[in-house]
Amino acid sequence: MEVDSNSSSGSFILMGVSDHPHLEIIFFAVILASYLLTLVGNLTIILLSRLDARLHTPMYFFLSNLSSLDLAFTTSSVPQMLKNLWGPDKTISYGGCVTQLYVFLWLGATECILLVVMAFDRYVAVCRPLHYMTVMNPRLCWGLAAISWLGGLGNSVIQSTFTLQLPFCGHRKVDNFLCEVPAMIKLACGDTSLNEAVLNGVCTFFTVVPVSVILVSYCFIAQAVMKIRSVEGRRKAFNTCVSHLVVVFLFYGSAIYGYLLPAKSSNQSQGKFISLFYSVVTPMVNPLIYTLRNKEVKGALGRLLGKGRGAS
């Protein structure tokens, strides 16, 4: 097979979501609708967290970080995906592919860390309620947020550097809808054993380890919730924790399946579906999961809309 000796030139061909061209218009409509819902839902949470004084708490500080992250995460891949679905041009420039690879890895790993931080916030809120605002002070909150974003950036630099050093095959056909590490490894013509080892090691650190920490923390949280005497207090703590756990299992489950399976042996159709799930579906449903049964967010939205009607 021909090896491209000049890996930093030319462009890549993204093979897309489906192998059936007649389904592209359907995928376009569904993904566009999902993207618009993602924008509306996450922007709403960000605005409410900033504008409503009652939501100026550590929990909503981290939730607004998650919403900002989801907005950037989905925007790093969906516009290019929609462009490829809409017309015959399926190419992406080398620079565009590199940018997408770096940004997607950065934001994905950041979310892995941020979900652990949010679990810690829930642990302190439920298990140490009297000391919550003292422990989760603004300095610590900003520090934890910075660690999340910088940790994700470190992951991006490591994985992207190893991936982009591979000799790519001449056809440059990426069998996916975005430039992602597993798909790029499959495109390589040389030995990828080191890349797969790095991928497995880094992804274990950013997925399996955080999930284990979160599950342990929720064991303590469950014990504390059962001791709450107030039915309303127990229900509020339960709803908040369940919402976070649902997001955790959706995101980590799809990430573990998509990244920790051997890059050369995983089913490509399933791989595309999983990539679509954590790049499109998860950012869309996160705002719904966190707000459907959240009286504080509903109240803040009602107050904001009420002010708007009053001003008009």
From Swiss-Prot:
Q: Indicate the transmembrane segments per the record.
A: 25-48, 58-79, 101-120, 140-160, 201-222, 237-261, 273-292
> What would be an example GO MF term here?
odorant binding
Q: List the disulfide bonds.
A: 97-189
Query: For this chain's UniProt record, which GO biological process terms are given?
Result: detection of chemical stimulus involved in sensory perception; detection of chemical stimulus involved in sensory perception of smell; G protein-coupled receptor signaling pathway; sensory perception of smell
| Stretches in topological domain Cytoplasmic | 49-57, 121-139, 223-236, 293-312
Instruction: Give tissue specificity per the record.
Output: Olfactory epithelium. Present in various subcellular compartments of the olfactory sensory neurons, particularly in the axonal processes and neve terminals.
Instruction: Enumerate the InterPro entries for this protein.
Output: GPCR_Rhodpsn, GPCR_Rhodpsn_7TM, Olfact_rcpt
May I have one GO cellular component term? cell cortex
Membrane topology (UniProt): Multi-pass membrane protein
**Predominant localisation class:** membrane
**Summary of the function given for this chain in its UniProt record:** Olfactory receptor that is activated by the binding of organosulfur odorants with thioether groups such as (methylthio)methanetiol (MTMT). Also binds odorants acetophenone and benzaldehyde. The activity of this receptor is mediated by G proteins which activate adenylyl cyclase. May be involved in the molecular processes underlying fasciculation and targeting of olfactory axons.
This one is known as Olfactory receptor 2C1
* Species assigned in the record: Mus musculus (Mouse)
